[in-house]
Amino acid sequence: MESTFIILTQIITFGTAWSMFHCLLKRKKKDWFSLVGALGYLLLPYHVYVVTESVDRSQILIWMVVPILAASLVKMSDTEKMFWKTGYGLTAVLALGIIGRLDGVAALTLLFLICVGGICRRQWQYPVIGILGVAMAYPTYMLSLIHIS
């Protein structure tokens, strides 16, 4: 059962990483570079450590959701139509909310990076998306604090 979970998550992670690199690259041969980028993403040392040592399933899921967050932010800043901007923004909020529910430190780190990226790219939507995503995960931590005390 454990190996089936790992194989399934790695297939999905490959798909999300390929999609992320496909959104990031603006070259003629972006399919080839997306394939190489996705394989590189799967072979990052910490990713390999998380998968092979089965540190925590939540860490495996975070590695699966981060490319969705990155692709959503890039597509949102590239598109002109408000309908698509809203859809990509909501996808990014949902992805960051999922990451926040899995690991609060990772969500706060990504919130910081999203805010810095928004300042550098002059995209006011980025900090708003980051704050909404972290706020979506906030009730999880409030409930855990109530149960502790």
Located regions from the model:
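Membrane-embedded transmembrane-helix bundle of lipid-linked glycan/lipid transferases
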Residues: M1-S149
